[in-house]
Amino acid sequence: MEKCILVPFDFSNEANFAMDHAYELARITSLPIHLLYVVPTEKEIEEWHVELKKIADKYSKEHNYKVEAVVKAGNLFETIYNYGIEANAYLAVMGTHGIKTIKKAMKVITKFVKIPFILVQSPINFGSYDKICVPIDDDKKSRAKFLWVKYLNNLFESKVYIVYPEVADSARKAEINANIMFATSIFEKDAIDFEVKAVCETNFADNLYDVMGKIEPDVVLFMTYKYKKSITEIKRARNVELSKKIPIMCVNPRTDIVKLGGFAY
């Protein structure tokens, strides 16, 4: 079955932003965009499909690109997950309302073990995914992010910024260095342009966004299980606002890179 980019849709401004971000990814891969709206009951499907199809057809005409409208009935989280599998989605882009809906977002993205989510709150801000920020620590599971960076670079020829916390513990420092070496081996082999930046571990979330304020990345990659912490621990007002502008790609440790033409680790 042909792969697609999935956009869970709710007729909000944020959903429209997600559609634009999805198009940036889809137009290079030539894969269709599927807009999915979930309704409570079967009897509502036909009515809402008419409305969603208007949006899909308008976007398709304006961009000369294939956009499909899909309306399903059922539990929101289960239905999004089931359709993602059914439609062979390899990537999903979803609009969020930030901290206000973080629990809802977590319920969706944690189900998708093999499908990463890009979460957006704003229009495309800096550019077309040609700057990628990858925060790392001593967790080996985070290496899945480097493989997704490799894939995104194949599409956009991106510059990558690895940001890590300076730690005193020798064991943790060794693990961080091992992760950096792992990334270096991948990026150098594929001639991916990258920089490595260290920040103070105290207030890491804010220090990370301070760096991103300077480099202006088009997307930042977090492990799904660290997404909530990475957002809720931001304290500085300027960084709270910045976090709304930079799309977040949530990656699970078991993401199936093989189906994207990458490799396992």
Language model feature labels by segment:
Residues 1-46, 131-175, 179-195, 217-219, ...:
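Small/aliphatic-rich secondary-structure junction motif
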Residues 25, 79-83, 207, 211:
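CheY-like receiver
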Residues 49-59, 175-187, 211, 232-241:
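Short, aromatic/basic amphipathic alpha-helical patches
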Residues 61-68, 189-195:
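A short helix-to-beta-strand connector/capping loop
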Residues 68-72, 138, 195-200, 227:
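Short, flexible loop segments at the rims of nucleotide/cofactor-binding pockets, characterized by
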Residues 71-79, 201-205:
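Charged docking surfaces used in two-component/phosphorelay signaling
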Residues 79-126, 214, 218-265:
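Gly/Ser-rich helix-loop-strand patches that form or flank binding pockets
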Residues 184, 201-213:
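A short, acidic, amphipathic alpha-helical segment used as a generic capping/interface helix at domain edges
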